Structures are given as structure tokens and as C-alpha cells.
């Protein structure tokens, strides 16, 4: 099903199958059944694991119940946007009914109508029981334009899913329109500069000082800003800000795969793989081009270079190979880290390969089978745990929304 909204092409290719039992042996499962198994469990992170008052995604779910920051009821805007698109996949896969999906979305939108918002942008985190902002950092206690763009990407997909339905479904779409029209992208130019800014705080103003320049996960923010019917920004913001007046172009070719765009802070070998996922869950990169790059090549080559790096395994970590690859930001042996070739700590994050299914179907399927064969030490209630180290035989039974919630919709985009 192609979902188009204004200048955006939101793509969810949705089919109908029954999910097979997750307890089935991998060698008895077809590729489709194995994808069903993983989609169903990761879908449940957002469905069964949602914070009950808001219906939104918890920032993290720790199966062992250990929450050092006492943040088990903190919810996330960006991760929820990914989870919202997982609901659409879940409806058409038969995990929940269309009516159940509608009721969950009504709860979510009702929460968003009254939750803390700053010139149309939501914070990175809220307290789920109150809708009040939970600071992400000392000065990061206001609007987060990028995380809101990820959330709105999901809401617009839901808008198109229900817009031609019954009266309740049309009413939901109308409420989403109001949230969409309220996003003040023009405010986040910080005084009409030709660039968007990531943060604004009612207490600290623009002190975070993070302009959205150069290639990372943020493309969808500029696409939405350009297509806003109420608070759009001029093309100069994209060209001078995001594209750095042409400075975004790259000649780097790790393992023979041209990156085409300079990855911020990782220009030679490429950044963490979530950069190839977050903006493209709803935005179809096929045939998406501008004067700087072909975005299908950008995301596919990023994934393939990451795959080839792990297969080549220059640091000699145990376990790396064609069926065990994928570097991205996740939990790590010591805290949290943005894993990538220039920051390879021997930690594999399953979402890196699994959310790359649209770009690397054969390589991602090999990884899926390889992860599944490893068994219960990395597999739990909501699918594969956030990260593991085959070299150190390390994992923890922890999940993060921004990793888990991309898997089901990106596998669906592939299917």
C-alpha cells in the first residue's frame, strides 16, 4: 500500500499472513514464517509493552526489572512514531484488528493533544502518566524537532490509512491534521536563518545550538518542513542548511560502496546504521534524488558497506560474519554507544541488519537466521535483545524503543 501525503511518499507494503508460533524451530520455518515471528514479537513492544496512560512507547523495557534511572514509565516521541507504523503493519498482518488499531490511535492522539509541546514540537521524552516533559539533558527540556518529525512521520501514515474510512476513522485523521498543522517548522529556523535547529527550550532558548546540517538521521525533518501546509520553510533552508551549500557531497567509497554524502563525524567509513532507517520508514528512498545524491544508493550502500565491514572483520572479533553483522547505536558492554566501523566495540545490534531488509534482503535474511539460531541467550519477549557481543558472550535482557520499533515496519516495507 502506497501512502502519499502532500510532498511525501509514505510507503508501507502490507500483505496478509498468519504469524507462526515463535516456538517453532528455525529449520522448520520458511523465510516468511521467520519474518512473521520476528515482526510479531517486535510489534508487541509497542502494543503490549506500551505505557498504559498514553499508549505510546516506553523509552526502554528491561525484562530484568533493573532501571537505574527509575525511568520505566518514561515515553519517547521518536520511538513512538516508529511504533505507530508498526501498528499499521500489525493490522494488515492480522495481529490486531483495524478497530483495535483505531482505538489505540485514538488514545495516542488524545494524549498528544494535551501533552507538553513547544511551538508545535514535542520533547524527546515525557512522563507517561502526566504528559509533562522529562528533560533529555540539562538544557534539553523543550521542543525536539527531529524526534517530533519521526513521530509525525508515523502519524501521517496513520492519517492516510484511515482518511477514507468510517466516521470515527475520519475524525481521527482530522485530529492528526490539527497536530500536523501545528508544527511550527518556521519557528525552528531560529530567527529566519536558512537552517533548521534541533532544539528550543522555554528556559534556555536556543542554547543547545544544534543546527541540522549534513548527513545523519534527520532528512525527514527537512522533507516535512518543506511540505508543511501551514509553517513551511524555503528551499534555501534545505540547500544551505542540510546540504551545506553542496558541502554535503562525498567521494568516500568504503569497501567499494560510494557513500555519496558526507556522514557527520564519520566521513570515511560511514555512521551508525540507524541513519539509513529512521527517515525512510515512511519516506520511500527509491527514485528519491536531488542534485546531491540518489538516496536509494545512499541507504543501500551504507548498509552494504556496514555488512562488508563486519564480514571483513578487521578487528578479529569472534562471531562476526555474513550471518552476524550490523553496527548501530544501542546498549553496549559499558553503557550506550553509537557503534559504527570507526567505533566498533565488538557489539552487534540486531536492528541494524533487520531494519535494513529493504536494502539488503539476502544479507538481512542471513543475519535473521543467524540471530535466531543463537537461541534464547539473545531472544526474549519482544524479539532479539537490544544488543549482544559474540566476542564477549555478553548481552542483557533489555530493549530500546528506537531500536525495537523500527524492525516490524522496515521488514514490512521489504515484504
Per-region residue spans from a language model:
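Bacterial Sec-dependent N-terminal signal peptides
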Residues: 1-26
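Ser/Thr/Asn(+Pro)-rich, low-complexity disordered segments
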Residues: 24-415
Amino acid at each position: 500500500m502506497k501512502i502519499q501525503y502532500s510532498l511525501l511518499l509514505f510507503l508501507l507494503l502490507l500483505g496478509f499472513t498468519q504469524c507462526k508460533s515463535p516456538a517453532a524451530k528455525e529449520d522448520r520455518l520458511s523465510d516468511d514464517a521467520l519474518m512473521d515471528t520476528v515482526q510479531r514479537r517486535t510489534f508487541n513492544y509497542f502494543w503490549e509493552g506500551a505505557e498504559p496512560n498514553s499508549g505510546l512507547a516506553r523509552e526502554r523495557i528491561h525484562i530484568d526489572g533493573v532501571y537505574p534511572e527509575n525511568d520505566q514509565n518514561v515515553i519517547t516521541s521518536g520511538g513512538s512514531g516508529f511504533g505507530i507504523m508498526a501498528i499499521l503493519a500489525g493490522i494488515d498482518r492480522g495481529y490486531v484488528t483495524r478497530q483495535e488499531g483505531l482505538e489505540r490511535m485514538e488514545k495516542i492522539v488524545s494524549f498528544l493533544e494535551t501533552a507538553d509541546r513547544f511551538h508545535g514540537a514535542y520533547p524527546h521524552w515525557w512522563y507517561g502518566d502526566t504528559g509533562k516533559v522529562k528533560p533529555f539533558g540539562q538544557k534539553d527540556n523543550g521542543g525536539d524537532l527531529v524526534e517530533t518529525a519521526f513521530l509525525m512521520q508515523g502519524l501521517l501514515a496513520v492519517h492516510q490509512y484511515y482518511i477514507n474510512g468510517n466516521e470515527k476513522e475520519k475524525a481521527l485523521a482530522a485530529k492528526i491534521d490539527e497536530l500536523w498543522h501545528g508544527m511550527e517548522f518556521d519557528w525552528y529556523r531560529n530567527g529566519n536563518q536558512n537552517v533548521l535547529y534541533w532544539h528550543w527550550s522555554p528556559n534556555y532558548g536556543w542554547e543547545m545550538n544544534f543546527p541540522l546540517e549534513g548527513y545523519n538521521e534527520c532528512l525527514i525533518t527537512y522533507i516535512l518542513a518543506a511540505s508543511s501546509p501551514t509553517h513551511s520553510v524555503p528551499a534555501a533552508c534545505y540547500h544551505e542548511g542540510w546540504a551545506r551549500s553542496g558541502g554535503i557531497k562525498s567521494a568516500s567509497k568504503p569497501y567499494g560502496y560510494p557513500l555519496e554524502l558526507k556522514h557527520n563525524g564519520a566521513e570515511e567509513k560511514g555512521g551508525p546504521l540507524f541513519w539509513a532507517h529512521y527517515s525512510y520508514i515512511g519516506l520511500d528512498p527509491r527514485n528519491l534524488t536531488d542534485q546531491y545524491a540518489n538516496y536509494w544508493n545512499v541507504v543501500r550502500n551504507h548498509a552494504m558497506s556496514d555488512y562488508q565491514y563486519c564480514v571483513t572483520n578487521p578487528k578479529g572479533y569472534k562471531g562476526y560474519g555474513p550471518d552476524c553483522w550490523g553496527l548501530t547505536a544501542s546498549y553496549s558492554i559499558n553503557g550506550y554507544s553509537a557503534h559504527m566501523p570507526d567505533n566498533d566495540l565488538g557489539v552487534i545490534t540486531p536492528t541494524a541488519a533487520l531494519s535494513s531488509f529493504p536494502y539488503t534482503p539476502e544479507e538481512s535474511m542471513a543475519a535473521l537466521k543467524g540471530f535466531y539460531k543463537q537461541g534464547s541467550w539473545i531472544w526474549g519477549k519482544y524479539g532479539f535483545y537490544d544488543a549482544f557481543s559474540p566476542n564477549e558472550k555478553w548481552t542483557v535482557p533489555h530493549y530500546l524503543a528506537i531500536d525495537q520499533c523500527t524492525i516490524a515496519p522496515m521488514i514490512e516495507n521489504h515484504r
